[in-house]
Amino acid sequence: ELFGEVRRLEMPFTIHAGECGSVQNILDAVQCGASRIGHGIALHGQKEAIAFCRDRQIGIEMCPLSNMQTKAVKDPAEYPIQEFLNANLLVTVNTDNRTVSQTTLEKEFAFIRERYAVTREQEVQMTKNAIEVAFASDAVKERLWKKMYTFEK
């Protein structure tokens, strides 16, 4: 009922889902109207659920260092960032809780670059994804796109 009211007001929202628990939590969150999923780790290996999120252009807010600290993946080698990028999900890199994780976006990007062979092109794509799924006005997004375009040159 509450999510219905939020949708009626056209307020975008994120639901933390899939950090632990099943992929069904993610699917339920999207069905409730979430336009972004915090973490989304449970999508790992779930081709139909990945397609479901991709087709609906759901942002996947990955928090690599936090996910390592909380052991959201049993084996850090299985962290699904490359899987999600290769599936063309709208992956973004996030800090989760900077003060708890003692991290910054710079540290997050350095970690995934070193540990998961994330390329500069993928970093740029994730930054573009962040602009695309941002809960910001069109004017703010336009300013960000211009900065991004300048940065790429």
Explain the meaning of each model-derived region:
Residues 1-15, 19-35, 44-58, 75-90, ...:
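Histidine/acidic residue-rich metal-binding segments in metalloenzymes
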Residues 16, 37, 60, 96, ...:
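Divalent metal-coordination and catalytic microenvironments
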Residues 16-20, 40-42, 63-67, 98-100:
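Active-site beta-loop-alpha junctions enriched in small/polar residues
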Residues 22-23, 45-46, 69-70, 100-102, ...:
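Short secondary-structure capping/turn micro-motifs that flank functional sites
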Residues 33-35, 61-68:
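Short, basic, glycine/proline-bearing loop/turn elements
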Residues 75-130:
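Flexible, acidic glycine-rich loops studded with aromatic residues
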Residues 117-153:
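Mid-to-C-terminal alpha-helical segments outside catalytic/metal-binding sites
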